[in-house]
Regions:
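Exported/periplasmic ABC-transporter solute-binding proteins
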Residues: 26-144
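Short, linear, compositionally biased motifs with a strong N-terminal bias
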Residues: 15-17
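Bacterial N-terminal signal peptides that target proteins for export
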Residues: 2-12
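Short secondary-structure boundary segments
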Residues: 2, 25-26
Length: 144
């Protein structure tokens, strides 16, 4: 009987551990409709979000918008697009700020706040859960 309870507890812990991963939906990297571009590559997004470039290839200024640490969208974006953990990102920006080479992207609280800022500012680029994308923004990159 004890063995069966241990198995059930172990299974419950496993399911709780995996549930955030299973709940992560597709993401969309979005831009203001007036931004002069139709798509971005993963490498371009990487460079923008790590502050390595502040302008698109056509010369347009770009302002990356991040989400708060701990959000599912942020975790998926950094894992799948930037290929870095929250710890690695924090260390990266600490180094960059300390050496005076830049500042991290501005942060918004959630998907909706990111989308609202992108709609209001023609230079903003953000990532959101694909389910909230509508015709007020354009998708320039998709993450499955």
């Amino acid at each position: 009987m004890v063995n069966k309870r241990q198995k059930i507890k172990s299974l419950a812990v496993l399911m709780l551990t995996l549930s955030p991963c299973l709940a992560m939906a597709d993401l969309a990297v979005i831009a203001n409709k007036e931004m002069p571009l139709t798509s971005l590559s993963q490498e371009e997004i990487y460079r923008i979000y790590l502050g390595k470039t502040k302008f698109l290839s056509n010369g347009a200024k770009v302002i990356p918008v991040d989400q708060r640490v701990g959000s599912n969208s942020r975790a998926k974006f950094y894992a799948d697009v930037i290929k870095k953990s929250d710890t690695e990102i924090k260390a990266y920006w600490s180094r960059v700020i300390f050496t005076g080479q830049g500042y991290p992207p501005i942060q918004e609280s959630d998907d909706r706040a990111v989308k609202d800022l992108v709609v209001k500012n023609k230079n903003c680029l953000g990532y959101v859960d694909r389910s909230i994308v509508d015709d007020s923004v354009k998708v320039v990159f998709s993450v499955s």
